[in-house]
From Swiss-Prot:
Name of this protein: Acyl carrier protein
O-(pantetheine 4'-phosphoryl)serine sites (modified residues): 35
InterPro entries, A to Z: ACP (IPR003231), ACP-like_sf (IPR036736), PP-bd_ACP (IPR009081)
BP terms from Gene Ontology: lipid A biosynthetic process
Subcellular location: Cytoplasm
Keywords: Cytoplasm, Fatty acid biosynthesis, Fatty acid metabolism, Lipid biosynthesis, Lipid metabolism, Phosphopantetheine, Phosphoprotein
Entry similarity comment: Belongs to the acyl carrier protein (ACP) family.
Post-translational modification: 4'-phosphopantetheine is transferred from CoA to a specific serine of apo-ACP by AcpS. This modification is essential for activity because fatty acids are bound in thioester linkage to the sulfhydryl of the prosthetic group.
Domain Carrier: 1-73
Chief location: cytoplasm
Function: Carrier of the growing fatty acid chain in fatty acid biosynthesis.
Length: 74
């Protein structure tokens, strides 16, 4: 499964959104995600990909998060 699809699946599960709402360019604000929601998503992603996400700075969109995960899992 590609990184985007897995990240999308986690966001859908954690935030209760439809997959159609979670696109690369979608911001977490557009998903009505507060800081706790983002923390939960990041925690799940860290577990799934066995990485440590150092900061949420610059992770404003789903695409930003996907790019970060892809870089960390190279």
């Amino acid at each position: 499964m590609a990184v985007f699809e897995k990240v999308q699946e986690i966001i859908v599960e954690e935030l209760g959104k439809d997959a159609e709402e979670v696109k690369v360019e979608t911001t977490f604000d557009e998903l009505d995600a507060d800081s706790l929601d983002v923390f939960q998503v990041i925690s799940e992603i860290e577990d799934e990909f066995d990485i440590q996400i150092e900061t949420e700075e610059g992770l404003n969109t789903v695409g930003d998060l996907v790019a970060y995960v892809e870089e960390k899992t190279k």
